[in-house]
Amino acid sequence: RARRVLNEWHLQDFADRSFGTLSDGERKRTQIARAVMPDPELLLLDEPVASLDLAAREQTIKIIGAYASAPEAPAIIMVTHHLEEIPAGFTHALIMSEGRVFAAGPIESTITSEKISEAFGLPITVDSVDNRYRARAH
């Protein structure tokens, strides 16, 4: 099972290395892989790609998206402050504003320019390319 999880999270080349020798991106993926080892019913990811460089961030987002799309995947709650970090394949979203739930539901009807603009009090354009979101203030 451990080898399969290492392969799923693209960590097979690091199986024999100590944690301290891994890059930040490799460490984040290792921590997530460790969390999925016991086949959880719920996986909570709190800003899993924060502080990663572009390559590590995109690789990790892609892996999380693929994992989330698998039929046997647990329910996943992912906290992020950046729409660009939402993996393709996520189906629902919740927007918080001032410590309260502002909007929640299917991602296509929740992550919209109107709702994001209202939640943040700033005119923001939201669009999606290949099921990945991005936001731009104007």
What are these regions (language model features)?
Residues L43-E47:
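Catalytic Walker B motif of ABC-type/P-loop ATPase nucleotide-binding domains
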Residues T80-H81:
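H-loop/switch region of ABC-family ATPase nucleotide-binding domains
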Residues S18-L22, E26:
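Conserved ABC ATPase signature
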Residues A119-H138:
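ABC ATPase nucleotide-binding domains
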Residues R1-F14:
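Conserved ABC ATPase "signature" region
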